[in-house]
Each structure stands twice: as C-alpha cells, then as structure tokens.
Design a protein with these regions (language model features):
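Alpha-helical structural context detector biased toward long hydrophobic helices
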Residues: 2-286
Length: 286
C-alpha cells in the first residue's frame, strides 16, 4: 500500500570526501577490530577513486591545446562516464549482493536453513551481510542517519574539526555502508530462527524490509542497546537473526502473534507496505 510514494533521484550517488570527512570516518570506527580497520582503509581507497580520477582528468584538460577538438570530445566522454559511474557503482554493488539471495530465499521458504549452518563457501557470512544491507540501505535509515550526522555537523566542532569541514550529505552513504559491514561482522555468529506462520494472517513486508525488533520506531532518537533483526521472506515464512531465546524454528499459531510483527514492520516503514491480502492492507490505512 503506497504511503506518499516518491522517487528519490541519485539515492546512491557517491559524493567527494574531503580530508576532514575521511578523518571523521576513521575516528568513528577507531574502536573496531584490526580486520575491520583494514576493510575500512580498503573501502576509503575505493570510495575516493573517483576523486583521484577526476583530479587527473582536470590536469589532462589543463595541458591540452585549446583547439584540440577531438581530445576535448574524448574528455567530455570520460567526464560523462565518471558521472554515470558515481551514480551507479554502489547500487550495482548492492544488486550483486541481492543476486546471491536467489538461492537463499527459496531455501528459507522451504524451511531449509542448512546453507546457514552447514553451508560451504562462507554462505553464512554472505547471508548475514545481505540481511544487514537490506536493513541499512533504505530511505528511512538514511533519514535517521542524516539526522544524526546533521547534529554532528552542527555540534561536533573543535580545533580538529572546524565548523563546516564535515557535511552530512557527503558522509551518510559511506557511513551506512561501513556501519552495515561492521554490523555484519558482529552478527557473524548470531543464531538464525525460522518463523513459520500457521495463523490466518499473512506476514506483510515494506520499504523497510528488515527491522530491529528492539528499536522504538515511534522515537528513533532513543538509544538502542539490543539488536534482533526480523525479516519476512514470504506471507508464511520470516526469520529472526540474533534472537538467543528462540530456537531454530518457531511456529506462530495465533493471529495476534503475526499481527504483532506486522505492526512493528508497519511502524518502521516509510512510504509503502505490501501484502498478498488486500484486507490486511486496509487495516493499516491512515
């Protein structure tokens, strides 16, 4: 069900980072593991590739003869290619990760979690990474992250970071990617619970497909001290990631149990919710 549907242009467009913004990112993740810090440096190097390429491009443009029309056309083509790449490369990377879910999600719908517990080729790690990405890559999470970074932009001011040296618009995308990666590292050994819906109410999903059941979605400014991801896969199957209380499989037999999860997911959604039963959507009309 649409809730003020809108399309956000350039949602994944990579912005340039200045030296202070890179320093801020390193400071934010200073207490992470050595292995993650190595990943962080690799990410920064990759993320700033466009800046290095564009700086080289500007140098080449400056040394070309003014009347060199063929070279000028070539440079314009390169400029256009770099601009397209800034828009697409991160979204394409997300799509590659999502492509791997083609094998996992049908297995879960068949109540088969063997790929997670007994799978080869680090499938567990890649699946956890996929779930974290589904949580962090949404408009709602972006909005909340922007709010926090705007506060940092305004109040995180000192001799090391003079006012105006960091911009939320530049930071939110790399920060979300890195927080997602860090979350994946933390949850690597987390248990997976299969929720089997035996009630008369189907699971719904939304534009926030993964939620933290421990978050207060009526007030996201509240500090969150626990994390249990909930991810509906189909109207009859969902998963919990990092719930140490539940076992490997839990059957939900009452409508109230399923409705409680649906209500949480609705509160977390930003613009859209989806269901295969129209009557269920009617319950959430505002």
């Amino acid at each position: 069900m649409p809730r003020n549907i809108a399309f956000e242009k350039d949602f994944y467009r990579i912005s340039s980072l200045n030296d202070k913004e890179i320093e801020f990112i390193r400071l934010f993740f200073r207490k992470t593991s050595d292995s993650f810090k190595k990943e962080l440096e690799n990410f920064i190097k990759l993320y700033t590739t466009f800046d290095r390429d564009e700086n080289l491009f500007k140098v080449l443009r400056g040394i070309l003869p003014i009347d060199c029309s063929e070279a000028d056309e070539a440079m314009e083509e390169i400029d256009s290619m770099l601009d397209i790449a800034r828009n697409n490369i991160l979204e394409d990377t997300y799509c590659l990760f999502e492509g791997e879910s083609i094998s996992w999600l049908p297995s879960l719908c068949n109540q088969d979690t063997s790929f997670f517990y007994n799978g080869k080729d680090d499938q567990r790690e890649r699946f956890v990474n996929f779930v974290c990405m589904q949580y962090y890559r949404t408009a709602g999470i972006k909005e909340n992250t922007m709010r926090v970074l705007k506060e940092a932009e305004e109040y995180f001011v000192n001799p090391q970071f003079p006012k105006g040296c960091i911009k939320a618009d530049n930071l939110y995308l790399p920060m979300l990617w890195l927080i997602s990666a860090q979350c994946s590292d933390v949850l690597l050994k987390a248990p997976l619970t299969l929720l089997i819906n035996k009630s008369n109410v189907p699971f719904i999903t939304s534009d926030q497909p993964v939620i933290n059941t421990k978050a207060d979605y009526s007030d996201l400014s509240k500090e969150i001290t626990e994390l249990v991801f909930y991810y509906p896969i189909s109207p009859q199957i969902a998963i919990l990631l990092n719930d140490s209380v539940c076992g490997d499989k839990v059957e939900l037999t009452t409508d109230d149990e399923v409705t409680a999860y649906n209500d949480l997911l609705f509160k977390a959604s930003k613009k859209m919710i989806f269901s295969n039963v129209p009557d269920i959507l009617e319950q959430y009309k505002k």
